[in-house]
């Protein structure tokens, strides 16, 4: 009788252990799913189409483009203006130096520009879509929070990522591989929606972006009066 009780007890603990393991696996899967979708879920608008219906062009936001001789490369800042301050100016400078095509979506509000943030995998803006269809390489510039001056590099173009990281390190920039939630590996990310289906995304921390501007400020006045001499010092 005691043997049977021991067997039942052992079986009970085995089943309990299996159940606990199963629960842990489910929790981990759910956590990773939520982490992946977190940036999109916090956006006010599901995509650009929804944003456009609820906002006013040239009041809340504007789009600027520049067509260059080197049309094979497009430099973008889809969270420009007051959304991720400094990204428009930095992307424009890269475009000017390399003679690359340029695109930016800028938040123009005095406040609450973060409400105009549409994640890169849902940014279905028609002008950008047309540019991407005729582009072989894309360099997407973004802003990321952080008190240390760091460039996080991601995207599906490993060769281009390696080359950019190498050159940045030569200039004494700290370059790190992007964390999973901003790694830009999705085929739906605008960085990868070009002819080659791959591109590079650079996430520049707040501390790093401030270094490109006078007095280390990212306010609208400082950005609108940006000195390209100051930006050039970091090339």
Predicted segment positions?
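A glycine-rich, hydrophobic loop/mini-helix early in the fold
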Residues: 90-122
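Active-site and ligand/interface coordination hotspots across diverse enzymes
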Residues: 31-83
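N-terminal carbohydrate-binding/catalytic regions of secreted carbohydrate-active enzymes
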Residues: 76-93, 97-98
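Hydrophobic membrane-insertion alpha-helices, especially the h-region
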Residues: 17-29
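Conserved small/polar residues in nucleotide/adenosyl-binding loops
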Residues: 229-234
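N-terminal Sec-pathway targeting helices
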Residues: 5-20
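Structural recognition of the beta-strand scaffold that forms the well-ordered cores
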Residues: 74-76, 103-104, 138-140, 201-203
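Catalytic cores of processing enzymes, dominated by hydrolases/peptidases
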Residues: 115-137, 143-228
